[in-house]
Regions:
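Short N-terminal secondary-structure initiator segments
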Residues: 66, 70-73, 128-146
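Conserved radical SAM core fold
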Residues: 81-83, 107-114, 124-140, 166-170, ...
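Conserved non-cysteine loop/helix-boundary elements of the Radical SAM core domain that shape
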Residues: 47-58, 79-85, 134-150, 168-179
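Distinct, well-ordered alpha-helical segments
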Residues: 88-89, 111-118, 174-179
Length: 199
């Protein structure tokens, strides 16, 4: 996010504090419960799920309502959002409302979908450490797919960051150090998440 967008976002928080007019500044939308991966720690049963997603019109109407309420940032997640054929339309609609739009992805479908998603303000790619640790958590070949996605995003001037779920497996194998080194080398941001127990 650019400095000016951050400044504008901070201004909205200050305005809400002064006016006491609260609204959801940031909203995460789970646009699908389907996923093409079966990560070992995932709490959802998303893998190869054969269910219908809410239709495009549902999301566009919801985005209209969020815009009217004053929402400034919409974060698209899943499952794997790129399994939706209309993801480009949803992104364009959010951006057309002047809102910031971010998305999470496992990276598999990014190269094939880059034209639909390059208007995003940022793309967050799942990456859990070096190839061995990552693929142990996410499945064979996922590390290379994630790196491909990061490189495609960078070539298309799409700000990208990695999202790492910290587990005993990858922490003991130097995941944090590997990700930070890779981020410096290639040039992307990184965030780290802890597993939490589902209740």
């Amino acid at each position: 996010m650019s400095f000016f967008k951050q400044l504008r976002f901070a201004g909205e928080i200050i305005r809400a504090n002064i006016t006491k007019h609260w609204f959801p500044l940031t909203v995460s939308l789970t646009v699908t419960n389907r996923c093409n991966l079966k990560c070992v720690y995932c709490y959802g049963s998303y893998f190869n799920r054969d269910i219908d997603d809410f239709p495009t019109e549902f999301w566009l109407k919801l985005i209209d309502k969020l815009h009217t309420m004053g929402t400034k940032l919409v974060h698209l997640e899943g499952g794997e959002p790129l399994l939706r054929k209309d993801i480009g339309k949803i992104i364009d609609y959010v951006k057309g409302k002047g809102m910031i739009c971010r998305m999470n992805s496992n990276g598999y479908l990014v190269p094939a979908s880059i034209q639909e998603i390059k208007r995003l303000d940022s793309l967050c790619i799942s990456l859990d450490g070096d190839e061995e640790s990552n693929d142990k958590n996410r499945g064979a070949g996922c590390y290379k797919k994630a790196l491909d996605a990061i490189m495609v995003a960078k070539r298309n001037h799409l700000p990208v960051l990695s999202s790492t779920v910290l587990t005993q497996n990858n922490v003991e194998n130097g995941a944090i150090e590997h990700i930070l080194s890779l981020a410096r080398e290639i040039g992307f941001g990184s965030q780290f998440n802890f597993l939490y127990e589902q209740t």
